[in-house]
């Protein structure tokens, strides 16, 4: 274990590392596409309701089910209220909150890097820094307003604390961060603490007094955090609610057509494919880390204590993969909590691979070993990770049309005293949230081929933010079976604007006509959106110079006759460009 670095050099390292990571994460806050409708409807919309008194409501927020935490929403409302106090528009409030998420993620990642440098291995810390700097998976997850992203940051802090020498303080810190991530964020992230608990039992074997005192304090803090969360959520819902337990009940114990599987299932290899896209060869080094650690232990390359320490750090990655691979319902966001563990395992795997390679070369010929270009190989690995990650990030921008189109509605000349309806059909799941609409606009749904349940609307409220009626009133026409609710739809005649996506190969149906070719509507603003059916896989997954994507048209349509000041739209187009 390396000696501790001077406090001054560590503080300088923190400032520089945090600054670079913050800049990189802020690019995510500015440009990342919201690719999960759950993030919008279950988190951004309730946050908008808390801040402004109106927004869309999913069945999960009905007090009958209560599987979403208002405490989690309220925590993110703090920077929202600060941004409002600064006089920012609702769109800028959205990006301000994202910026706070970016900086918090950078803070957590910096703590992990310095913890690895102090207590583990400086070479691994360098590899970890490079992986985090250029990793497209972390770039996306860092600014997601999802409980799994929140849990990811808490796991990062817990992992940082775990790397310090054993003590009561370490145990309390690790348990506290895991509890915060599980109770306020996502309860399943608690499974990542299993290796640490086992390590503690091994370290304190036979010293029951120390074990009792250490864990008594840790459990007390965990219960305190849990009690605070239950209290806050119960105040919002106006009834006793333990949301984390409700989530577990719904996802694990639900029967009779309930549960997550009704929203779709994926094959066992889904996560390997997805992690390969998000982390490229970083995943390979992470997967190799476990076998390399076992090999090192069997060949006496590392002692038993080092083996236990390494195993407790990297095993959560494999445990998490196993747990979620066997679940039929799979989502990209379910992997977020292990992203920092994956990156650390990859850094360790890269370090051990290089050392193993050098050892093999030494056994062959010392001259060959001395000429082996270690630094060049490391730089090549970094370059491959960086190029693939940048290509992935750029490719995702091909889906950013909704983030451009919706704000442009505010440039259309409308009467601010009249509520306008912005309607969406098949594109309901790409809606970026009410933060992107003008103050006097409301999102409405028109019938499409989708036959599941769509969000309803919170009861609009002028009450103080902590006592809005939508928190505790039981809404009508909600169900947990994903059954279609016809009350969600509005007539096309009541729409003022319509958002649609059109491709050259689009075929009209009764419920999904090609609106731009109909008599009643005309597109007034169009933005390119990648055509995933006509673009080869490599062109969709990565920005490849020799593969030109095929494009569709993401459109704002208005009723005929058109009564719009087109100079405003031209100005909007220039600003977005």
From Swiss-Prot:
Sequence intervals crossing the membrane: 69-89, 96-116, 137-159, 177-197, 218-238, 281-301, 306-326, 334-354, 376-396
Function: Catalyzes the transfer of mannose from Dol-P-Man to lipid-linked oligosaccharides.
Residues on Extracellular side: 30-68, 117-136, 198-217, 302-305, 355-375
Family: Belongs to the glycosyltransferase 22 family.
Species per Swiss-Prot/TrEMBL record: Schizosaccharomyces pombe (strain 972 / ATCC 24843) (Fission yeast)
Topological domains, Cytoplasmic: 90-95, 160-176, 239-280, 327-333, 397-577
Protein's recorded name: Alpha-1,2-mannosyltransferase alg9
Annotated Pfam families: Glyco_transf_22
Pathway in which this enzyme or protein is active: Protein modification; protein glycosylation
Keywords on record: Endoplasmic reticulum, Glycosyltransferase, Membrane, Signal, Transferase, Transmembrane, Transmembrane helix
Location(s) in or outside the cell: Endoplasmic reticulum membrane
């Amino acid at each position: 274990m390396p000696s501790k670095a001077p406090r001054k050099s560590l503080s300088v390292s923190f400032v520089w590392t945090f600054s670079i990571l913050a800049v990189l994460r802020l690019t995510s806050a500015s440009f990342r596409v919201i690719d999960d409708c759950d993030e919008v409807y279950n988190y951004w919309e309730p946050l908008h309701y808390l801040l402004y008194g109106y927004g869309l409501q999913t069945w999960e927020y009905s007090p009958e089910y209560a599987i979403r935490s208002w405490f989690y929403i309220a925590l993110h409302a703090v920077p929202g209220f600060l941004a409002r106090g600064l006089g920012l528009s609702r769109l800028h409030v959205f990006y301000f909150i994202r910026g706070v998420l970016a900086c918090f993620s950078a803070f957590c990642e910096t703590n992990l890097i310095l913890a690895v440098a102090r207590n583990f291995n400086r070479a691994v810390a360098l590899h970890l820094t490079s992986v985090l700097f250029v990793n497209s998976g972390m770039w996306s997850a860092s600014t997601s307003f999802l409980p799994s992203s929140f849990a990811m940051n808490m796991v990062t802090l817990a992992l940082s604390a775990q790397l310090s020498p054993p003590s009561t303080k370490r145990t309390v810190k690790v348990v506290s961060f895991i509890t915060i991530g599980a109770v306020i964020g996502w309860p399943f992230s608690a499974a990542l603490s299993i290796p640490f608990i086992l390590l503690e039992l091994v370290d304190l074997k036979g010293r029951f007094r120390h074990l009792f005192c250490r864990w008594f304090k840790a459990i007390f803090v965990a219960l305190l955090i849990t009690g605070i969360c239950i209290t806050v959520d119960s105040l919002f819902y106006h009834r006793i609610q333990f949301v984390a337990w409700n989530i577990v009940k719904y996802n694990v114990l639900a029967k009779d057509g309930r549960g997550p599987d009704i929203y779709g299932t994926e094959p066992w290899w889904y996560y390997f494919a997805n992690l390969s896209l998000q982390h490229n060869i970083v995943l390979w080094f992470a997967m190799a880390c476990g076998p390399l650690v076992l090999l090192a232990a069997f060949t006496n390359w590392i002692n038993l204590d080092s083996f236990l320490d390494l195993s407790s750090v990297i095993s959560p990655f494999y445990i998490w993969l196993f747990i979620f691979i066997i679940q039929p319902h799979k989502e990209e966001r379910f992997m977020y909590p292990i992203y920092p563990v994956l990156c650390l395992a990859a850094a360790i795997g890269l370090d051990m691979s290089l050392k193993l390679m050098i050892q093999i070369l030494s056994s062959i010929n010392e001259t060959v070993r001395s000429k082996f270009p270690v630094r060049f190989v490391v730089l090549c690995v970094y370059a491959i990770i960086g190029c693939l990650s940048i290509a992935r990030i750029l490719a995702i921008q091909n889906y950013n049309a909704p983030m451009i189109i919706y704000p442009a509605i505010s440039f259309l000349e409308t009467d601010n005293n009249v509520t306008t309806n912005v309607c969406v059909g098949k594109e309901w799941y790409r809606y970026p949230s009410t933060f992107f609409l003008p103050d006097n606009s409301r999102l409405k749904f028109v019938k499409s081929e989708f036959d599941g349940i769509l969000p309803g609307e919170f009861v609009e409220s002028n009450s103080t933010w902590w006592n809005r009626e939508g928190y505790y009133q039981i809404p009508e026409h909600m169900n947990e079976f994903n059954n279609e609710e016809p009350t969600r739809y509005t007539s096309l005649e009541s729409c003022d604007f319509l958002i649609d996506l059109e491709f050259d190969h689009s075929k009209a149906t009764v419920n999904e006509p090609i609106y731009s070719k109909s008599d009643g509507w005309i597109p007034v603003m169009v933005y390119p959106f990648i055509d995933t059916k006509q673009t080869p896989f490599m062109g969709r997954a990565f920005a490849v110079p020799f593969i030109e994507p095929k494009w569709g048209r993401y459109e704002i349509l208005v009723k005929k006759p058109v009564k719009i000041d087109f100079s405003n739209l031209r100005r909007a187009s220039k600003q977005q460009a």
